[in-house]
């Protein structure tokens, strides 16, 4: 009788310790930050976002500083683990030696998940920095979607989709919400409609044209990014992952007819017009990988 009682007490104690350990693991705030360049304050021209361009080094400095502002905001909110993914072009733009050492940096390419490399279900929130309006936006600074040389428009389940929505879908696959997005005013208006009104936005500039803007000076943009990142992370309960219902019907409208012709060589891809192809996938990660493959093939 005493042995059985002792056994039960021990079992309950072990169970309690296990629950306590699990709870302790969940108390840390883990944040993923994807950093693009076209939406950074002060950036308005292709020369600034192209490696080797005349103003590139200054623009990458501003990009790095906006990433650091988001890191500081995450730390202000109590983040215990932060991963930053360089998400522009070559994905070798952020100045590694200048990134806040509280974060870990993912740099270089190719990467399977591209702008979202490193995301998984262990993260609590996603932040987008330096993002831009989708291709074809009337008032978007350096607007494009994934490949300015190939993609004229992109739809997922009939919804207009830019890089913000595309990457939010990847985060949603892992049940992680996007909570704060920084970029130009047109981008901010777009994501409020597509991802929902709760997403916190930071307007870094307002387009005057595709290559001109009324912009915050970098130091002011960085202050706002830090403040808004912290504010968003302190109210995580209001956010939900972006998860349209599967299956995922993806429609790519290319710039040129030969690009659609190349893409339609892939089994399962239907050419629905001269420049447009369509395919369906039950899993969004596979849908995204197919998208990348088709864009690569289109550019061949």
Predicted regions and their residues:
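Bacterial N-terminal signal peptides that target proteins for export
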Residues: 1-9
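C-terminal segment of classical bacterial N-terminal signal peptides
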Residues: 14-22
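Mature N-terminal segment immediately following signal peptide/propeptide cleavage
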Residues: 25-46
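Alpha/propeptide regions of enzymes that mature by internal proteolysis
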Residues: 54-86, 91-92, 102-104, 228-235
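A glycine-rich helix N-cap at a beta->alpha junction
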Residues: 101-119
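Active-site glycine-rich loop that binds ribose-phosphate moieties when present
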Residues: 148-174, 183-187
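Active-site rim beta-loop-alpha module in soluble metabolic enzymes
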Residues: 170-178, 182-233
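C-terminal accessory domains and tails appended to enzymatic cores
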Residues: 218-300
């Amino acid at each position: 009788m005493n042995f059985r009682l002792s056994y039960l007490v021990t079992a309950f104690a072990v169970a309690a310790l296990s629950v306590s350990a699990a709870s302790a693991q969940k108390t840390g705030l883990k944040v993923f930050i994807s950093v693009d360049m076209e939406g950074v304050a002060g950036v308005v021209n292709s020369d600034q976002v192209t490696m080797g361009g005349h103003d590139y080094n200054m623009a990458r400095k501003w990009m790095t500083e906006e990433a650091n502002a988001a890191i500081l905001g995450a730390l202000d909110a109590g983040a215990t683990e932060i991963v930053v993914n360089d998400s522009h072009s070559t994905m070798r733009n952020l100045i590694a030696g200048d990134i806040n050492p509280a974060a870990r940096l993912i740099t270089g390419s190719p990467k399977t998940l591209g702008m979202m490399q490193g995301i998984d279900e262990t993260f609590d929130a996603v932040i987008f920095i330096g993002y831009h309006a989708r291709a074809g936006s009337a008032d978007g600074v350096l607007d494009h979607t994934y490949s300015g040389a190939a993609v004229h428009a992109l739809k997922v389940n009939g919804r207009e989709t830019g890089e913000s929505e595309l990457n939010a879908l990847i985060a949603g696959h892992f049940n992680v919400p996007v909570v704060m997005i920084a970029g130009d005013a047109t981008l901010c208006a777009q994501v409020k409609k597509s991802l929902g009104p709760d997403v916190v936005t930071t307007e870094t500039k307002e387009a005057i044209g595709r290559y001109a803007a009324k912009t915050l000076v970098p130091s002011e943009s960085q202050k706002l990014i830090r403040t808004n990142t912290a504010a968003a992370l302190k109210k995580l309960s209001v956010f939900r992952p972006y998860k349209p219902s599967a299956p995922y019907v993806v429609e790519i409208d290319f710039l040129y007819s030969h690009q659609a012709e190349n893409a339609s060589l892939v089994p399962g891809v239907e050419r629905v017009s001269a420049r447009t192809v369509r395919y369906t996938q039950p899993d969004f990660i596979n849908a995204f990988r197919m998208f990348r493959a088709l864009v690569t093939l289109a550019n061949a």
